[in-house]
Amino acid sequence: VHRRIIVPGALGAASVLLAIPASAAAPSPGAPGIGDPYYPAYGNGGYDVSHYDLRLTYRPDSDRLEGTATILARTTEDLSRFNLDFLLDVGEVRVNGAKASFTTSGEHELEITPKRPLAKGTPVTVVVRYGGVPSSKEAYGFTGWHRTPDGGVAANEPEAAWWWFPSNDHPLDKATFDVSVQVPDGTQAISNGTLRSKSSRSVFDLTTGTTESGIPVVNAYSVDLGANDGAARASVERTGEVADWLSGYFGPYPYNALGGYVPNTDTGYALETQTRPFYSPRQFANGSNVSVVVHELAHQWYGDLVSVRGWKDIWINEGFARYAQWLWSEHEGEGTARELADYTYASHPADDPFWTVRPGDPGPENQFDIAVYDRGALAVHALREKVGDEDFFAILKGWPAKYAHGNASVADFRRYAEEVSGEPLAALFDTWLFRPSKPEAPAARAASLAKAADTPAQPRSWRKIAATNDVHAH
């Protein structure tokens, strides 16, 4: 376990050096949101987190979770107080060693007032002791914590942290994590990243392997998946193979751990939790589905390595993860990307509400609408036809490297694609991502469609791809 030690004497000296001069404006409360117009209360202002250390104890029988979160951050403005996003009951908060007062507000705000104001640029250590029953908590009428027969799962987007640790919960504030979970013997806890140690008897069936580049792969399956067990394993066990294949398009796999897990939960979606995607057993109710594994692993580059600047930029995540499925279909001989584009385009007449959703800015109510995925992938294919394969695949691989471990917007992607291809792309992006109407088919697709008297034949891969359409619903 990695630990970071802050020497009290050094911290005290820093506090003196950074003391607010008498002539400065009085410190003010940090904003209760990071500034995302889709979700104004998500994330918080006034500080930037670098690391979370989470020490947790969980009782599966009662769903009782107790924890101590140590948060390392630095202020970005003079603060009289600041917020964390959190739902469980808080017993104590300390800021730089001193007890702080706290209260709650809104749906998920923990307001913390330190003993003394914090000057801009101050290193801050926040310790929060807490406990509660995550499954008993709701915000905005839903929960991101899902009970299973033997425990619980925290997996949701764009929010899930509130149910198990206090945080600045928005992709703009990236941080590293150490997670330690104590559970009763016969129970296991699974999280992201590299496993440091374990001492409990297994209730998950763990399988291990490595990718061709030597990345360790750990997959976990609940022992009570029933009829879905075989199909789940036949899909998720190909994780290493799929990651190696995606590396050919997106560049080297960006992390030092890899895997997937399938708990016995009644949710219907999968989620690209970093390094170890979550899959619902229902994803495999109709047999194996490697396509959903492709989708979630594509997000390790498009969504995790490079994250959205704001949630309106969701097309960069979902359009490219869907297009990765189209490329996999081609790889498996089950339909080319063009055939899938033709079928998708022809399947939705001009008056279909599908075309009213704008993937480049869909609004929070349509953030995970099927059009963000399928029309989003059509936009990716239109880009490919516009710039040609050489530049297209250079863009596909270069983008994750350019913005690695950062955030970017749809506008950033357009500028990058123009830089690589030398083509003006504003009109294409406007047509496929922002107009609430069915675009004219590109010349290549129009010619292809003209040869077919009726709707093009459904590619063999279509049903498996469509089975991922519930991926992120609450």
Give the ranges of each region predicted by the language model:
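N-terminal, polar/Ser/Thr-rich
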Residues: 2-8, 12-20, 24-66, 146, ...
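Surface-exposed beta-strand/loop patches in extracellular or lumenal glycoproteins
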Residues: 66-89, 165-169, 176-184, 411
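Hydrophobic helix-coil surface modules that form long, contiguous segments used
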Residues: 67, 170-294
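Zinc-dependent metallopeptidase catalytic helix centered on the HExxH motif
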Residues: 233, 275-341
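Amphipathic alpha-helical substructures
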Residues: 336, 369-443
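Long, His/Glu/Asp-enriched segments that create or flank divalent metal/ion-associated functional microenvironments
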Residues: 439, 443-474
